[in-house]
């Protein structure tokens, strides 16, 4: 998806990195190195960040439209560019401009998508010295969701997120995203999961069957994220958004990633638009999107 959406104009690459949602998310076990084995189904939606990468002679620079984002080596896009030059031995630089639309720290893989997009763009600007597998390997070292973001669409992710299997695409639907103004610590959510039994786990096989059957309502019925109960206990506003979304006509709703964004699946544009308008009175980060395959 990223390579197809990247346009080269001379020494510049223009690309988009899209948001993802979790149709299912299960945490299976904790490894000795502290990482967790997960099993989840992810889906791309049409909300995107716009990224421009210019090929320069030396140095890496980052600029964004959000003043609070780091524009140094702490930014995952910077890490992506740095990793590319170290992996290839190329002596060069990059000027990276990111226009953020995807909320930060929202459970939507905004940063991971930026990372994958920058790796793809710089690789193309230099004549594709790295294979797709090599890009995926670098991406996995920078973030668990990065490998998924290279191709997006509907995929099953296992391991720590690096073992990917393409699935039948999700049927067309309207996806409403609402992020409350809170910051959730993913590490803290995992810590809570480690210390308490998971009572309800996703029906991953059933979700795959529903995808194979192009059954939107079966997909909606099987939305499940084991992190949701933990996050919602800490931040009741998450549960409140989910309840309101369903009352507004969503076929179903669930939290994405470690949160705090909640998304609802709508089969009718007018219901989705009306719900989005009602949330926009209360929250800044409200986005009416569509499934993207």
Regions found by a protein language model. Give the residues of each.
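Short, basic/glycine-rich phosphate-binding loops at helix/coil junctions
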Residues: 57-70, 118, 213-223
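Solvent-exposed alpha-helices and their adjacent loops that cap or buttress functional pockets
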Residues: 7, 43-44, 140-141, 147-150, ...
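Conserved, helical-rich catalytic subdomain that frames metal- and/or nucleotide-binding sites
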Residues: 151, 156-252, 267-270, 277-280, ...
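ATP-binding N-lobe of GHMP and related small-molecule kinases
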Residues: 2-106, 124, 128-133, 160, ...
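Contiguous, small/hydrophobic- and glycine-enriched helical/loop subdomains that border
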Residues: 93, 115, 119-156
